[in-house]
């Protein structure tokens, strides 16, 4: 077949280019990089000139080349040089050595070996060729192999065809697999197989990693996110994904010199936040590195040949991860049902300074600032703490932080406490705490004050300009924080700036002091002993007081109730206002209104508080924003007819004020919703998110540009049809590739396809092309699309900032709704049988008739035995509680404390009647455990905690002491217990419940003639031949239990029978011995009195009475 004729369709599929074409630049795998037809023509001309020069050079060297071509397959087209010779341009095929010396990279040895047998197949070497010609042959051969890739790659190369111009992100996905510079020439360190230079993308990753060595980096590479090096190993372990082996270190360590790439692991783009959440939950700090350029805009820019620009865009830890969409939806029912521990999400900053003393006399001044990024709440405090660090522990247990930032060095005692609470998953928080550290300069106080002042300077200007007195006072309060608190605040602002969340500190309205004396103090021991937030078995919420009272329907309501439980009120008026609101909500006359509110709360499926703060941060997604605004609109419209508190239908000021605040946001919400295209927002369509009238000029411009390009593409159909001899062609879309022109291979039109058309794909029947005009227009359209996406994101960010201006009014409405949720929850508890409204008094007393333990009652299948309590600061201030082991002593004293706490929360209490005074604190000393980290024994812990109670307790406190003195010998234990009890009653005068097995202490009642101390015991009945088998009655009665019946507990614990019998025998012997000794002492006392009755004083008589009672 003549070379000038049209090739067959089969020849179109497989054609062999010229050798010189392998030395020219390859077309890139993107639409933007495909050359136009003019450039292609120039390149072909250059190829012909180069071949001609080479042939002339060969003739001069005397070399000849065989004209025989190995062309076994008839569908392979002859090379360009042969076509040129046929046309009469040259008579011989000779190759000239080029004059310009090109610096070529040597090929890998394996590539040379693969093609050794097939090189120069069509021109066998001449015997007399010179060394220079041999070198030239080898150089050309290496060029040929490098460009072609191997002897079999000629198959499938067609005329003017190019691979589909896939988006550059796909290429970026394999950036680390790009061919790297091969090793040096043969014989030079070829043993280091795989050693190579770093790719541009790997250099980017290393540069970012060196700045964030403590961070697990997730790098966007095309359509995947990838982990490299040690981060890949971490991700594989935590996420259970595959880690491809390679280098783990980022410092080019010699031990990994034999490896040619980094270890890697990958995750899909759409699963990014799922895996990030799992990593931060495991305690890791995670950074997301994103591509900052798009394919279309990059191709049009000046850096088209450089790698994609990448930047660390997000940093996450457990406390700063606010992009969790799962936590925004759903009610509290599932959490309450499982009893799982609810993390508060606080990040706490702590610093301390030693003020005086050392050892047991040590005093430290501590400052804390805690922020909850998910809600915007901020807590601060400065306080002095003793060597037991009970104050720090109290705040840590109340706040339950998930992260702790330590500024400067802590003392050993504080360091041990923080490490103990954060270092294991079985602590009171139920999870590990992430601990970070920040340096503290000697001039930290001055620097921190300057930093905080400059941070709030802009806000101060705005406040002064608007003459907002309330905002000004709040801001002034923040600026006047104590020295230690200011250091913490400054450190937290810097720390949160790293995560882009520092704006949370601009919300000065939500700063709260921790140690406000408007709340009852519940320290760490009390929280644990009374199981306020977590049970002591598995540290879950099930079985805790919070679990008992939690009937909330929303997440933000649940968080508010948690604060109420941990901070019972001291203000009698505020307390009565809250309990009156609960009473009204359970009133049958308000059933319809209460059901309306319950129904409204039940329809709220999102965490409004978290969504609002995400809007404030500018991180809210479009569907989430639509849900937020629609939910706020639903809430406001539910009470749209309420103009004032008097219109609500409730008489309680607390309820009516909360309801009246809800419709005030309706106008702003509707104004924002009117700007949104609901359908597009629901589908997260950024291009149509705004209504047409609300679109910015930039968005409109690029939309018009896209429309113009698509119009030109439509017009181009006629032009393409004329070329193919048709009236008009139709575009087809295959595998996501648009605007393809399909031409049947057997039709006459295939012969009319210009060489400038790029073949994209095809089958046996059809070939599909892109014309140069289509390629140009698609490039324009992609640029417009990328610019449109950037414009839409910019307009959305501006819209979020506009909504943020109404943040405080929206937040206040959500807080009002949370208050209603909490009150309805307490009303639900109050509707349970056996609950009563407590009566409050300013006099310190606890008078409860038929009281019950609120948690045990719900967990027990059997009915709970109720008991009375009557403590009064002017009458009986203390009860000495005795009774057998497992007789219910601890449950009884816990019941008293829990009823007092519930009453001051504003809840109904489980009793027939209750009169409660305003207690300022509840202190407990229960259980026996040592503190190995501090080197303290069980008895040392007992006495240290008791000492703290004696220092902090007031006449308005309730103190519970359980078996004080059991950690040492009987004589010392009795002496200490007696001294402490006496001091509590006479000096401190607080309400006291004292549990003991020391029956000798019962004689103390004679020291208090006004009955400040009473003896009570837990009733039981004896049975069996030896009266060792007892039945617990769990009733509290006057008197003393003279035996503890420990052998009965041993029997219940299934100790071996012989062991119990031996213990019983020894117990009887010891009891008889003590009985005889007491009897002998009584006889001696009587003898002394009878011998000299005149000298018998009052103390001798008291000793006689005491000895008689002990018998």
Swiss-Prot record:
Heterodimer consisting of msh2-msh3 (MutS beta). Forms a ternary complex with MutL alpha (mlh1-pms1). Component of the post-replicative DNA mismatch repair system (MMR). Heterodimerizes with msh2 to form MutS beta, which binds to DNA mismatches thereby initiating DNA repair. Msh3 provides substrate-binding and substrate specificity to the complex. When bound, the MutS beta heterodimer bends the DNA helix and shields approximately 20 base pairs. Acts mainly to repair insertion-deletion loops (IDLs) from 2 to 13 nucleotides in size, but can also repair base-base and single insertion-deletion mismatches that occur during replication. It comes from the Eukaryota. The keyword DNA repair applies. This is DNA mismatch repair protein msh3. It holds the Pfam family MutS_V. Residues 1-141, 155-197 are annotated as: Disordered. GO terms for cellular component: nucleus. Belongs to the DNA mismatch repair MutS family. MSH3 subfamily. Transmembrane segments: none annotated. GO terms for molecular function: ATP binding; ATP-dependent DNA damage sensor activity; mismatched DNA binding. Residues 50-59, 97-107, 128-141 have a biased composition (Basic and acidic residues). PANTHER family: DNA MISMATCH REPAIR PROTEIN MSH3, DNA MISMATCH REPAIR PROTEIN MUTS FAMILY MEMBER. Residues 166-179 have a biased composition (Acidic residues). It is found in: Nucleus. The gene is msh3. Its main location: nucleus. Residues 1-36, 86-96, 110-125 have a biased composition (Polar residues). InterPro entries: DNA_mismatch_repair_MutS-lik_N, DNA_mismatch_repair_MutS/MSH, DNA_mismatch_repair_MutS_C, DNA_mismatch_repair_MutS_core, DNA_mismatch_repair_MutS_N, DNA_mismatch_repair_MutS_sf, DNA_mmatch_repair_MutS_con_dom, MutS. Keywords: ATP-binding, DNA damage, DNA repair, DNA-binding, Nucleotide-binding, Nucleus. Residues 192-319 are annotated as: Mispair-binding domain. ATP binds at residues 883-890. GO terms for biological process: mismatch repair; mitotic recombination.
């Amino acid at each position: 077949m003549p070379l000038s004729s049209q090739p067959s369709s089969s020849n179109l599929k497989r054609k062999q280019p010229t050798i010189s074409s392998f030395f020219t630049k390859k077309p890139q795998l993107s639409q933007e990089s495909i050359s136009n037809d003019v450039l292609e023509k120039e390149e072909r001309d250059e190829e012909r000139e180069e071949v001609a020069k080479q042939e002339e050079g060969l003739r001069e060297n005397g070399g000849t080349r065989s004209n025989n071509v190995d062309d076994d397959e008839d569908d392979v087209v002859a090379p360009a040089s042969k076509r040129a010779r046929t046309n009469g341009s040259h008579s011989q095929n000779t190759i000239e050595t080029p004059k310009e010396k090109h610096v070529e990279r040597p090929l890998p040895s394996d590539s040379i070996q693969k093609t050794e047998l097939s090189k120069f197949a069509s021109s066998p070497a001449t015997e007399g060729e010179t060394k220079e010609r041999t070198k030239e042959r080898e150089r050309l051969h290496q060029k040929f192999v490098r460009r072609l890739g191997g002897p079999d790659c000629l198959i499938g190369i067609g005329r003017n065809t190019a691979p589909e111009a896939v988006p550059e992100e796909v290429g970026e996905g394999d950036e680390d697999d790009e061919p790297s510079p091969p090793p040096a020439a043969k014989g030079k360190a070829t043993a280091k197989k795989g050693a190579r230079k770093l790719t541009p993308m790997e250099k980017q990753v290393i540069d970012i990693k060196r700045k964030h060595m403590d961070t697990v980096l997730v790098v966007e590479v095309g359509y995947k996110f990838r982990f490299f090096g040690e981060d890949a190993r971490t991700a594989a372990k935590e996420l259970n994904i595959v880690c491809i082996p390679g280098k783990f270190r980022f410092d080019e360590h010699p031990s990994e010199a034999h490896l040619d790439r980094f270890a890697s692991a990958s995750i899909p783009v759409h699963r990014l936040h799922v895996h990030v959440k799992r990593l931060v939950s495991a305690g890791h700090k995670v950074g997301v590195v994103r591509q900052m350029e798009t394919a279309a805009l990059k191709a049009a820019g000046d850096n088209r040949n450089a790698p994609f620009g990448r930047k660390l865009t997000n940093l996450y830890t457990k406390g700063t991860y606010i992009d969790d969409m799962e936590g925004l939806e759903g009610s509290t029912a599932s959490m309450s049902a499982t009893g799982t521990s609810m993390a508060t999400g606080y990040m706490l900053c702590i610093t301390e300074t030693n003020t005086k003393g050392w050892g047991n006399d040590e005093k430290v001044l501590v400052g804390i600032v805690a922020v909850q990024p998910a809600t915007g709440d901020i807590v601060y405090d400065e306080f002095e703490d003793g060597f037991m660090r009970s104050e720090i522990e109290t705040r840590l247990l109340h706040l339950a932080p998930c992260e702790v930032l330590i500024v400067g060095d802590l003392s050993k005692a504080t360091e041990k406490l923080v490490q103990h609470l954060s270092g294991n998953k079985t602590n009171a928080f139920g999870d590990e705490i992430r601990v970070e550290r920040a340096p503290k300069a000697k001039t930290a106080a001055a620097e921190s004050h300057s930093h905080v002042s400059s941070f709030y300077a802009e806000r101060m200007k705005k406040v002064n300009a608007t003459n907002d007195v309330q905002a000004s006072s709040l801001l002034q309060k923040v600026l006047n924080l104590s020295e230690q608190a200011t250091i913490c605040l400054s450190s937290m602002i810097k720390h949160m700036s790293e995560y882009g969340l520092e704006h949370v500190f601009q919300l000065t309205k939500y700063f709260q002091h921790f140690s406000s004396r408007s709340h009852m103090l519940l320290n760490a021991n009390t929280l644990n002993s009374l199981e306020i937030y977590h049970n002591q078995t598995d540290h879950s919420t099930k079985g805790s007081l919070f679990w008992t009272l939690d009937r909330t329907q929303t997440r933000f309501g649940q968080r508010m109730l948690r604060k109420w439980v941990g901070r019972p009120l001291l203000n009698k008026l505020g307390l009565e206002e809250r309990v009156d609101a609960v009473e009204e909500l359970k009133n049958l006359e308000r059933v319809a209104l209460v059901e309306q509110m319950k129904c409204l709360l039940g329809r709220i499926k999102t965490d409004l508080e978290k969504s609002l703060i995400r809007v404030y941060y500018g991180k809210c997604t479009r569907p989430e924003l639509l849900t937020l605004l629609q939910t706020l609109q639903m809430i406001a419209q539910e009470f749209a007819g309420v103009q004032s508190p008097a219109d609500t239908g409730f008489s309680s000021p607390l309820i009516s004020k909360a309801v009246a605040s809800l419709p005030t946001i309706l106008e702003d919400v509707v104004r924002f919703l009117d700007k949104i295209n609901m359908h597009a927002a629901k589908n997260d369509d950024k291009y149509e998110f705004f209504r047409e009238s609300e679109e910015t000029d930039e968005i409109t411009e690029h939309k018009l540009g896209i429309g113009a390009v698509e119009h030109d593409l439509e017009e181009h159909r006629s032009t393409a049809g004329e070329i193919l001899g048709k009236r008009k062609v139709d575009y087809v879309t295959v595998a996501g590739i648009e605007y393809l022109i399909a031409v049947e291979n057997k039709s006459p039109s295939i012969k009319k396809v210009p060489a400038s058309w790029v073949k994209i794909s095809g089958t046996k029947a059809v070939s599909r092309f892109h014309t140069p005009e289509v390629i140009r227009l698609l490039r324009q359209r992609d640029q417009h699309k990328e610019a449109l996406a950037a414009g839409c994101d910019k307009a959305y960010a501006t819209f979020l900032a506009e909504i943020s201006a109404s943040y405080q009014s929206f937040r206040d409405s959500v807080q009002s709704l949370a208050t209603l949720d909490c009150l309805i929850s307490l009303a639900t508890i109050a509707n349970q049988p056996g609950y009563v409204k407590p009566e409050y008094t300013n006099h310190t007393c606890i008078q409860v008739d038929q009281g019950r333990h609120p948690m045990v009652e719900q967990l027990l299948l059997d009915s709970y035995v109720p008991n009375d309590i009557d403590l009064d600061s002017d009458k009986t201030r203390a009860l000495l509680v005795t009774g057998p082991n497992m007789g219910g002593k601890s449950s009884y004293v816990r019941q008293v404390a829990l009823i007092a706490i519930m009453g001051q929360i504003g809840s109904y209490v489980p009793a027939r009647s209750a009169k409660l005074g305003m207690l300022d604190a509840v202190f407990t000393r229960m259980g026996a455990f040592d503190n190995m980290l501090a080197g303290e024994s069980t008895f040392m812990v007992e006495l240290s905690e008791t000492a703290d109670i004696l220092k902090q307790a007031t006449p308005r406190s309730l103190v519970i002491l359980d078996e004080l003195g059991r950690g040492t010998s009987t004589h010392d234990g009795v002496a200490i217990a007696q001294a402490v009890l006496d001091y509590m009653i006479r000096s401190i005068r607080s309400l006291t419940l004292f549990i003991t097995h020391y029956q000798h202490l019962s004689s103390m009642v004679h020291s208090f003639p006004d009955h400040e101390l009473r003896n009570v015991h837990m009733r039981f009945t004896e049975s069996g031949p030896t009266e060792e088998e007892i039945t617990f009655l769990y009733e509290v009665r006057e008197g003393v239990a003279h035996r503890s019946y420990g052998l009965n507990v041993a029997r219940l614990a299934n100790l071996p029978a012989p062991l119990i019998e031996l213990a019983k025998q020894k117990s009887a012997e010891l009891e008889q011995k003590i009985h005889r000794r007491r009897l002998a002492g009584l006889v001696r006392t009587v003898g002394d009195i009878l011998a000299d009755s005149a000298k018998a004083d009052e103390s001798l008589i008291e000793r006689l009475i005491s000895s008689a009672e002990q018998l």
